[in-house]
Amino acid sequence: MSNLPHLRPPIVASAVLRATAAAVCLLAGAAFAPAHAADAITAGSITNSPPMISYAADGTTLQGAIVDLAAAMSLQMGRTIVFKAIPFNGLLPAMQAKNIDITFTLMNDTPERQKVIDFVDFFNLGTKLLVQKGNPQHIDGLDTLCGKTVSTVQGSTQNLLVDEADAACKKAGKAGIENLKYAQPSDARMQVQTGRAAVFFGNSPVMVYLAKTAGDGKIFDVVANREYQPVPLGIGVAKDNTALRDALQKSLNALIADGSYLKILEKHGVEGGAVKTATINGG
């Protein structure tokens, strides 16, 4: 977690494809069609949120459910997806500046974001609360955060949840919530590990994964039976690029239909977030 790298140079998904090509070919039942550089799709993403997307032990190879989905979709489309590491709050500006073609990351499809870009929804998830192992501050939902310090990722939908909880605390005559915002999820999670923050608000599959794996499961817990903001994740595409949007949707639905999509999610233990169909702007 905290030892995961921060920003890296752009990672060409073809390098990832080489590592996963055999598995993907078995899943997708399609031969890899090499893409010319001009046909590459540049995908902006945060790169430190396992098991969805993160660097492997070599520090250069991307891995995770999003990476494998991108590889399988590349096979379907015959176009290589190139991942570019960008802080979460820089993803939409990068899209607007045409520095990337898509966002393929843990970005919720929300009505507010739909005003700026279109989404191809590929996964369902919510928000869970990550706390220190043993939950020493006895966090049991949003109403127990009054007077506490929490951490979030800048620009994430979790900030809205914190704002609502803060307002509820103050309305009840209690102390508000201090929100520490960070560009990188690993930095935000570190605040919980060190005790500076009581809670990190993060995406459910990542929080569950970290609670099980960080420090062999001895660093974090998730607050049980609490999940908020059930919203789909979407691949973001510029509104004027409907051809790419529709191609992404078609490739993803093909993977859903032939079973490859579910097998990829099962490989990473996140099949609970599977969608039945890839919809456009379903959030």
Please provide the spans of the model-predicted regions:
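Sec/Tat signal peptide C-region and signal peptidase I cleavage site
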Residues: 31-37
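Extracytoplasmic small-molecule ligand-binding "clamshell" domains
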Residues: 38-106, 258, 267
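Periplasmic-binding protein-like
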Residues: 47-49, 124-131, 212-250, 268-283
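Ligand-binding cleft/hinge of the Venus flytrap
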Residues: 55-56, 71-77, 158-181, 211-215
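Short helices/loops that flank or line small-molecule/ion binding pockets
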Residues: 72-76, 84-85, 89-102, 116-117, ...
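Ligand-binding clefts/hinges and TM-proximal coupling segments of bilobed small-molecule sensing domains
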Residues: 80, 157-173, 253-283
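A ligand-binding cleft/hinge motif common to bilobed small-molecule-binding domains
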Residues: 90, 106-114, 161-165, 198-229
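Flexible hinge/capping segments at coil-to-helix
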Residues: 132-150
